[in-house]
Amino acid sequence: MNVSNSKMKSFDEYYEKNMKSLENVDNDNNNAGNSSNNNFKSYNKSFHNKKPNNKFNKDNKNADNKVNGGNNNHHGNYSNANNANNFKQQNNPSNQQVGQSYIERMTAKNRKFLENYNPKKNAKIKIIPLGGLNAIGMNITVIEDENDIIVIDCGNAFPTEDLLGIDLVIPDVSYLKKNQNKIRGMVLTHGHEDHIGAIPYILKELNMPIYGTKLTLALVEGKLKEHKIVGYKLNTVNFSDIIKLGNIYVEFIKTNHSIVDSAALAIYTKAGIVMHTGDFKVDYTPVFGDAIDLSHFAEIGRMGVLALLSDSTNAIKPGFTMSERTVGKIFDAIFNEHSKDRIIVSTFASNLDRVRQVIDTASRYGRKVAIEGKSMINIINIATELGYINIPKGTLVQTEMLKNYPDNKTVIITTGSQGESMAALSRMAQGMNKMINIKAGDVVILSSTPIPGNEKAVNKIIDELYRRHATVIYQDTHVSGHACAEELKLIYTLVNPEYAIPVHGEYRHRKEAANIAESVGVEKKKCLLLEVGDVLEICNDTAEVKDRVASNGINVDGLGVGDVGNIVLKDRQALATAGMVIIAMALSGSSSELISGPDIISKGFVYMKESEDLINGLKDVVRNSIEVYRNDNSNDWKKLKSLVTSAAEDYLWKVIKREPLVIPVIISV
């Protein structure tokens, strides 16, 4: 397959017009690339009018360099400048040679596969999202190619406020259980909880091989150990590797996100190539490792991509997501300004780039660093063992050793940036931590943004910190790990999919992502907004939702999985909002005559001593219900319980406008 000159010329024009401002990453990236859609439409006209060939191009080295990693001056700071290369060589734990193009990195086996890959006419695939849509969390997608199924990610979601007592929510995999004989494996994009958190629960029901990058699998292994799942084989994959799962082939592509070792996936099926971006951003100056492999996206785009499932989280935000390195400069300024104070930094445990920058900044300012929070300690230990974090010698100290150093010579990195009640920061703010408590003069940096639904908890912890006279800094101390609108335009343009399927976001995020895809040339009717459980079937030039499968989340409460359904939750909500009324009575076993009672017990409903009239009225209602039951000559006490419950509920609503949980207890005498 030949690469047309018009395409490459268009890419150059696109870059000059829309990305020039990225040449200096110190600038505010949010203001970069705000060109009109007309520029993108102009570019896309030449790109989309030419039908992509499904044969791989053997001679694309020059084109590959042109898109990413070449020495063209106009590519600014993300080209192969010497400084960038030196940094990458020092910090990249993988063995791949820095600066090599996608083609040069490819093994002979992979090259041969791609040369011979050609989708078949009339072949069809199914794409089934079992989670991850209309919410942030529980990401899991099924790709089905005739007799082969692969599963992409398997995450959990945190419970909403109405799920009382629930610890987390995992996906319903009933469809996978029914088709277990087709499952060839699970492939993982990265190691965040919303992508790997449900794996231990699912593996207890479904046995399948798991594939992912080094850090991702290390985190999964830790989870399996927590659940006492030992001896399970996890298969490590390097970037640009292609693995065979039945008749499906999966290629791992380097991306950037707020956790290292994140990957996009190119899935080669009989019907065509399906790409899944995973969670990603375009960061040309990452703190750790290489920048996103845009050349890889472009090469696969030239082959012809059937469908692109793309991260939509930040689709509603214009411009570009700022580089992670900008946060390091903010940290430096804060450390410089507060040189006489103790500094506490709270962030996501999995954000190793952020943790690394805090440690490096502390080391430069001669401060000792203590780590607080179980998940933070675990992840840093794993990352250190794998070589993803190099901590300067003598920088880390145990928490109990902090007392040996003056406050202005210490930094504490902790969990709890989301206001979690039992996390380390929350316990510090409430004076419940054995070793560390917040005191006047402390500088607390919240280096994250609240996950949707956590805003109240975060505001509460900020208030607690203020009450303890701490200085709280939470503005400009975080950058997102998700692509904004201009980055999505770039990816949609490079990949040039036949179908755009926005994922990972609430409906408004996915709708805006669909608009972005349309703005760069994807037909409106081919921008598909699926719902969880939809079975999308793609065959030739048609894509249609053919069916729906079970997709409600499964609630996890303690050690119980799936035993807390809607009925139990409804009872919990009733208990939480209106309390409980127990009606106890003793009846004759032969005549159903009332022998004793009814006795009324109120829990969380009303104070009995101050509600005598209400309670006496309720007793009369119960007695009347018993008489109605006896007059029917019935001998079914289930019917009596139902009669008493209904009458009591009607009475209480009529008199006091409340709906407590009513529980009748009948004793046979």
Residue ranges of model-derived segments:
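His/Asp/Glu-rich metal-coordinating catalytic cores
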Residues: 92-185, 192-404, 423-437, 456-459
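Conserved beta-strand scaffold positions in the cores of enzyme catalytic domains, especially
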Residues: 127-129, 234-236, 307-309, 444, ...
